[in-house]
Amino acid sequence: MSCAEVMYHPQPYGAPQYLPNPVAAATCPTACYHPAPQPGQQKKLAVYSKMQDSLEVTLPSKQEEEEEEEEDEEEEEKDQPAEMEYLNSRCVLFTYFQGDIGSVVDEHFSRALGQANTLHPESAISKSKMGLTPLWRDSSALSSQRSNFPTSFWTSSYQPPPAPCLGGVHPDFQVTAPHGTFTTADPNSWPGHGLHQTGPAPPPTASESWHYPLASQVSPSYSHMHDMYLRHHHPHAHVHHRHHHHHHPTAGSALDPAYGHLLMPSVRAARIPAPQCDITKTDLTTVTTATSAWAGAFHGTVDIVPSVGFDTGLQHQDKSKESTWY
């Protein structure tokens, strides 16, 4: 062994740790005795050994450093936008894509559609079948409904039945008027009602149907009452028709001449025009004779006011007329 080789022996604290080999010491006179280092020195030695190990690591060459720098620059260039557009003070548009956008989009969609058809052909067929099933169901439903309609419904000669306009409102409502509800009677046969009518009454419609008989059909005495009312009050119509009753004609002039033979003598006398100077006299005589005649004719049917009271009322009325006339 050479003199540089030494043997390490673990020793207690304070004892020398490095002892020279006796054989080496005998052969090498330069070998000397060194005392063992302290614990602080041991730590320093450990740190020193680590520093040497780190220095022994091979450092990168200059070429490698340059390559790394170039790669970093390329990455930075990729991260930078290809186009920058200033929109406003708070918005700037950066465009990172380079190339033709339209061609890239077309290529993307064509590739996606091709993959969908090639990878999932069974799913596409099942979807098409699922889309057709509602049509089959609808066609079957239409065929079942078609069997419910008559054959003429599906041809051009089909005519729909008339819709009930009024019959569908209520089951008890009759669309057509029952037979015998209205009778087309001659309007001249109604006393007093034919005075202002120029033509026959219009035929009744379905909406104006009335299920109750007219008053003339219920009580036969209605016509007698109406005639009596006309012949009591209308003889004075020619006296004051110039004042406020100008739209009411006189009874004698408005009656049909066909009924002249049915009138009583007092009414016939009223039809003859009298001079203006004898108006009050003719009115008084006509009223008194008419009241006495009508009282005798309809004593059993209608109760009439006594002629005395009626005449006194008419005389009072005639006096008031005379005062305004003259």
UniProtKB/Swiss-Prot annotation:
<keyword id="KW-0804">Transcription</keyword>
<keyword id="KW-0539">Nucleus</keyword>
<keyword id="KW-0832">Ubl conjugation</keyword>
<protein>
    <recommendedName>
        <fullName>Transcription cofactor vestigial-like protein 3</fullName>
    </recommendedName>
</protein>
<keyword id="KW-0805">Transcription regulation</keyword>
<feature type="compositionally biased region" description="Acidic residues">
    <location>
        <begin position="64"/>
        <end position="78"/>
    </location>
</feature>
<feature type="region of interest" description="Disordered">
    <location>
        <begin position="54"/>
        <end position="82"/>
    </location>
</feature>
<feature type="cross-link" description="Glycyl lysine isopeptide (Lys-Gly) (interchain with G-Cter in SUMO2)">
    <location>
        <position position="129"/>
    </location>
</feature>
<feature type="region of interest" description="Disordered">
    <location>
        <begin position="184"/>
        <end position="208"/>
    </location>
</feature>
<dbReference type="GO" id="GO:0005634">
    <property type="term" value="C:nucleus"/>
</dbReference>
<dbReference type="Pfam" id="PF07545">
    <property type="entry name" value="Vg_Tdu"/>
</dbReference>
<comment type="similarity">
    <text>Belongs to the vestigial family.</text>
</comment>
<dbReference type="InterPro" id="IPR006627">
    <property type="entry name" value="TDU_repeat"/>
</dbReference>
<keyword id="KW-1017">Isopeptide bond</keyword>
<dbReference type="InterPro" id="IPR011520">
    <property type="entry name" value="Vg_fam"/>
</dbReference>
<feature type="cross-link" description="Glycyl lysine isopeptide (Lys-Gly) (interchain with G-Cter in SUMO2)">
    <location>
        <position position="62"/>
    </location>
</feature>
<dbReference type="GO" id="GO:0006355">
    <property type="term" value="P:regulation of DNA-templated transcription"/>
</dbReference>
<comment type="function">
    <text>May act as a specific coactivator for the mammalian TEFs.</text>
</comment>
